[in-house]
């Protein structure tokens, strides 16, 4: 009998990249692999693990928000509110995140027009660091092939993801184009290769 797969406790696995590129699909597929106990925590940022952050995220998706800075501060509020839950989970389990702080930089700063709102990049990045500096990732799977058009997936967004990948090359794995089965198999193989998955 094949043992159930087990993600290394304490590890943080990130699914990052362009909108509509398959991240949430892969999060859902990975969550159904029949993990050994304690099974990993699977979640999405910024909706996260609490009722408060799910409510805030719903607000940012549905409400008409005039200020780009206000939208990003609401997202960062969700991130900060989820830190205790993520920290607790990593004490004995792995965590798989659908979006990390890279999305906040790329879609918040570069696509969110925060410079036009008078927010220096160094200030915005410092706010992100305050929230995320104690949650380093073991691996970031970067999705750069959207399966359908999204107006936010501009060339600048693609470039900035590539910049972050180069800046963090030691932990970044670019996901090749492929169907859902092939992509799941690729992620599993990469987790094994990095000694993050056994069984």
Tell what function each PLM region has:
Residues 41-118, 122-123:
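ATP-dependent small-molecule kinase phosphotransfer cores
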Residues 104-163, 176-177:
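A glycine- and Lys/Arg-enriched "phosphate-lid" helix/loop adjacent to the NTP-binding pocket
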């Amino acid at each position: 009998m094949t043992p159930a797969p087990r993600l290394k406790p304490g590890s943080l696995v990130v699914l990052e990249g362009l909108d509509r590129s398959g991240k949430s699909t892969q999060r859902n597929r990975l969550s159904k692999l029949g993990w050994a106990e304690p099974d990993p925590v699977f979640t999405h940022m910024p909706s996260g693990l609490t009722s408060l952050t799910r409510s805030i995220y719903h607000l940012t998706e549905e409400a008409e928000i005039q200020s780009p800075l206000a939208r990003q501060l609401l997202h960062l509020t969700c991130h900060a509110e989820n830190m205790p839950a993520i920290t607790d989970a990593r004490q004995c389990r792995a965590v798989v995140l659908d979006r990390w702080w890279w999305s906040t930089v790329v879609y918040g700063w570069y696509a969110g027009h925060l410079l036009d709102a008078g927010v220096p990049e160094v200030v915005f990045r410092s706010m992100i660091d305050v929230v995320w500096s104690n949650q380093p990732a073991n691996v970031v799977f970067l999705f750069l092939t959207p399966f359908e058009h999204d107006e936010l997936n501009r060339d600048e967004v693609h470039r900035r993801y590539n910049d972050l990948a180069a800046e963090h090359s030691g932990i970044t794995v670019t996901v090749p184009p492929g169907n859902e089965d092939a992509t799941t198999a690729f992620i599993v193989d990469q987790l094994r290769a990095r000694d993050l998955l056994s069984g």
